[in-house]
A protein has these predicted regions:
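Active-site-proximal loop and beta-strand segments within enzyme catalytic domains
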Residues: 54-173
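Bacterial signal peptide processing site
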Residues: 17-18
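Short, well-structured active-site flanking segments
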Residues: 85-104, 188-216
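Structural recognition of the beta-strand scaffold that forms the well-ordered cores
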Residues: 37-40, 48-49, 72, 128-131, ...
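Well-ordered alpha-helical segments within folded domains of soluble proteins
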Residues: 78-80, 177-182
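Short, contiguous, pocket-lining structural segments
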Residues: 169-177, 189, 193
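A short, well-structured edge-of-sheet supersecondary motif
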Residues: 25-62, 94, 145-148
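Sec-dependent N-terminal signal peptides
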Residues: 4-14
Length: 217
């Protein structure tokens, strides 16, 4: 199976441009990274970029800092900032149960290590979600979820969602926790998450080229 195109954007504070480009080329040659854009911020605030590789598998161009990139799980940082703003404003606390805010989340059943389905006992808090200790996983962080298509048939799972993998606060697993944080922000603020982030996070930071959906223009 072909590996997906992996594009990494890194910002380094490096004083020497020649060494900077040499370091980038060495990284590209020593790994399976097909394309990379790297930048450095100079002491005067200016930025220099170095690129290597195509913007897509089927193109003969060179990728650059003006290409559009999917930032994927870096949106977790934005969602976390939004939630912590609400904590600062006293609209939610880190440790109160979220059952009333997100009943659909709280009722998600747990799949044990021996593939038994049990009802959750502990409530989920914002702290659990932010620290990835609420029990949610990904297919690439959980062996059970990686084969979920087959496993759910074996155990007779009929729900249209994936189970949690442990009681909140009892373990750690990188997973879909921040998706629920985004829903919590919407619930408390009464705003669409994209609108909230634009008004209170990306807007004030002048991140004017960051969107949920790329504008037509």
């Amino acid at each position: 199976m072909k590996k997906p195109l992996l594009i990494i954007i890194l910002f380094f504070i490096i004083s020497c441009q020649n060494n900077f480009e040499k370091d980038v080329l060495n990284i590209v040659k020593s790994t399976e990274i097909p394309a990379v854009v790297m930048g450095k911020i100079n002491k005067d605030g200016s930025m220099d970029f170095f690129s290597n590789g195509p913007s897509r598998w089927d193109r003969n161009d060179t990728i650059n800092e003006k290409n559009i990139f999917s930032i994927a799980s870096m949106t977790k940082a934005l969602g976390s900032v939004a939630a912590l703003q609400l904590v600062e404003q006293g609209k939610i606390t880190l440790d109160e149960p979220l059952d009333e805010y997100l009943p659909n989340m709280s009722s998600i059943k747990i799949l044990t290590q021996d593939n038994k389905i049990i009802d959750p006992i502990n409530s989920i808090t914002l702290r659990h979600l932010l620290t990835h200790t609420a029990g949610f996983g990904y297919w690439f962080t959980s062996k059970q979820l990686s084969d979920w298509g087959n496993l759910k048939k074996e155990i007779g799972w009929t729900e249209n969602y994936e189970p949690r993998l442990f009681e909140s606060g009892t373990s750690y697993m990188y997973g879909t926790n921040i998706d629920w944080v985004g829903r919590l922000v919407e619930k408390i603020s009464g705003m669409n998450l994209e609108d909230y982030l634009r008004k209170y996070v990306t807007g004030p930071l002048e991140m004017n080229s960051t969107w949920f959906n790329v504008p037509e223009n």
